[in-house]
Amino acid sequence: MSTAIIVVGANGRMGKTISHLAATESAFSLAGLVDSREHVESLAGASCPVGDSLAAVLPKAPGAVAIDFTAPSVSLQSARAVAASGHALVIGTTGFTDAEKDELHELAKKAPIFWASNMSIGVNVLCKILPELTRALGDAYDIEMVELHHNRKKDSPSGTALTLGECLAEARGWQLNDVRCSARDGIIGERPKAQIGIQAIRGGDVVGVHTVYFMGPGERIEVTHQAHSRDTFAQGALRAAAWLVGQKPGKLYGMRDMF
């Protein structure tokens, strides 16, 4: 039996990719499309229900799983809608504030909700590998990260960089917010040992590149993940949607739960 998918932000780059895969892969079916009022008219003629909010489409798609790659304010509206209806929701949006994340955790007690800053399998394998590497190398190695994205990305550092940074900080027994440095300028003195640098580069149409540097006495180790297309993230989101069908409300699920 195929998993029915509602795509929120259907006119966006990720939305279009997810819609195409959901409509063409036998394991999935397209059950609804959602976009803002100024863009929803372009969805006219679709073979599934269309609306300018997830709340408007959910009653027409019982049992469907919504996938939302939009903006924090829109994704929160989607989460509130499924909390009221009982549908499941996969969120790939980044840039949430701490207060918004807290609300997601509360809403996840009422409906199955899955959130990840990066849906690629490779990045989530890195989250398992990097802590082991960090502990093996020890405190003699400084940790820095550089992330590259296209010139239309709105948040910085990327959600993926922050997720990887949290994995690295936890391995050192730190809280990322206490040790993160995202800008250096002027006479700032020596680099503190308890620090993880995360620098962002924006330009062109780069899908996403994250490189972690371990710099120690006389040597440097570089670990890089490079996304070649958005299909990587779309496939991961669809995989999460299929997995979420069998889950119950109670916690905000993530990639670690699925793996």
UniProtKB/Swiss-Prot annotation:
(S)-2,3,4,5-tetrahydrodipicolinate binds at H150, G159, T160. It is an enzyme of class 1 (oxidoreductase). It is found in: Cytoplasm. Keywords: Amino-acid biosynthesis, Cytoplasm, Diaminopimelate biosynthesis, Lysine biosynthesis, NAD, NADP, Oxidoreductase. GO terms for biological process: diaminopimelate biosynthetic process; lysine biosynthetic process via diaminopimelate. Pfam families: DapB_C, DapB_N. Pathway: Amino-acid biosynthesis; L-lysine biosynthesis via DAP pathway; (S)-tetrahydrodipicolinate from L-aspartate: step 4/4. NADP(+) binds at R37. The active site is at H149, K153. It catalyses: (S)-2,3,4,5-tetrahydrodipicolinate + NAD(+) + H2O = (2S,4S)-4-hydroxy-2,3,4,5-tetrahydrodipicolinate + NADH + H(+); (S)-2,3,4,5-tetrahydrodipicolinate + NADP(+) + H2O = (2S,4S)-4-hydroxy-2,3,4,5-tetrahydrodipicolinate + NADPH + H(+). GO terms for cellular component: cytosol. GO terms for molecular function: 4-hydroxy-tetrahydrodipicolinate reductase; NAD binding; NADP binding; oxidoreductase activity, acting on CH or CH2 groups, NAD or NADP as acceptor. Its EC number is 1.17.1.8. NAD(+) binds at G9, A10, N11, G12, R13, M14, G92, T93, T94, A116, S117, N118, M119. Catalyzes the conversion of 4-hydroxy-tetrahydrodipicolinate (HTPA) to tetrahydrodipicolinate. Belongs to the DapB family. This is 4-hydroxy-tetrahydrodipicolinate reductase. It comes from Desulfovibrio desulfuricans (strain ATCC 27774 / DSM 6949 / MB).
